Regions:
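Hydrophobic core of transmembrane alpha-helices in multi-pass small-molecule transporters
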Residues: 46, 125-140
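Intracellular juxtamembrane helix-capping segments at the cytosolic ends
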Residues: 139-154
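Juxtamembrane intracellular "pre-TM" segments in multi-pass secondary transporters
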Residues: 17-47
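Helix-loop boundary and gating motifs at the non-cytosolic
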Residues: 37-76, 142-143
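Helix-to-loop junctions at the C-terminal end of transmembrane segments
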Residues: 86-99, 183
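A late C-terminal transmembrane helix in Major Facilitator Superfamily
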Residues: 156-186
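A membrane-interface helix-boundary motif in multi-pass transporters
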Residues: 1-6, 180-200
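Structural signature of the two symmetry-related core transmembrane helices
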Residues: 101-116, 195
Length: 213
């Protein structure tokens, strides 16, 4: 885990350094990103990653607590990754649609996903179905979010850096921390809390979409 975190930090540093080098060769782009003005958008994107805190940090522990074998949790993880890869290869046609609508669909699908994990923690059929939703809640959401920010803001490089830092950085850290506290106090309701957070992300993005009609 520490190696993966360190490697991610190194890669992120290289990407940011290269992006700065490229930006210096281009004309300066005026910053048109206003976090407070678009707070519903950024809150929704961040809450989505907060909801993943339970999954990334406690899914295996949660399932084995309910009697699912460790080998089966490995199969579940692997199936989710396969679904993610399939979506990444076939998402082009989906991204041609309204990106903000896709963000709403994927956050709502994530709320359903986490609720099903909470409601049926031992049902393997349901669990494999929830892992198939990883194609939506991670792969399609991530690509739609990047594309939406790219088309929304003129300062595209800064928008992507905010997305990585705020959404994945702050959101991921907060989600892991919150999941740890919830698991200590209410372990059974861990994924119910994730479902509620993902639903709040959906509501926030929905409100943002209504404002931008």
């Amino acid at each position: 885990m520490l190696f993966a975190t360190f490697a991610t930090a190194i890669i992120a540093f290289i990407i940011v350094r290269n992006s700065h080098a490229k930006c210096e060769k281009k004309e300066e782009v005026k910053n048109d990103i206003h976090l407070l003005a678009d707070w519903k958008l950024w809150l929704g994107l961040t809450l989505m990653q907060v909801s993943f805190g339970s999954f990334y940090n406690f899914f295996t522990i949660y399932e084995t607590d309910f009697g699912v074998s460790l080998d089966m949790t490995i199969y579940l993880w692997s199936f989710g990754v396969i679904m993610e890869i399939v979506m990444l290869f076939s998402q082009g046609r989906f991204l041609q649609n309204n990106l903000l609508t896709i963000l709403q669909i994927t956050t709502f699908a994530s709320a359903i996903r986490w609720f099903l994990v909470y409601a049926f923690p031992q049902d393997l059929v349901v669990l494999f179905f929830t892992q198939s939703l990883h194609a939506l809640s991670f792969a399609l959401f991530h690509s739609a979010a990047i594309s939406y920010l790219f088309h929304t803001y003129k300062h595209q490089a800064l928008a992507q850096q905010f997305f990585s830092g705020i959404t994945y950085g702050l959101g991921g850290f907060s989600g892991a921390l919150l999941a740890g506290y919830i698991y200590e106090i209410f372990p059974r309701e861990l994924f119910l809390s994730s479902a509620l957070i993902a639903f709040l992300a959906f509501v926030s993005l929905r409100l943002h979409a209504q404002r931008n009609r």
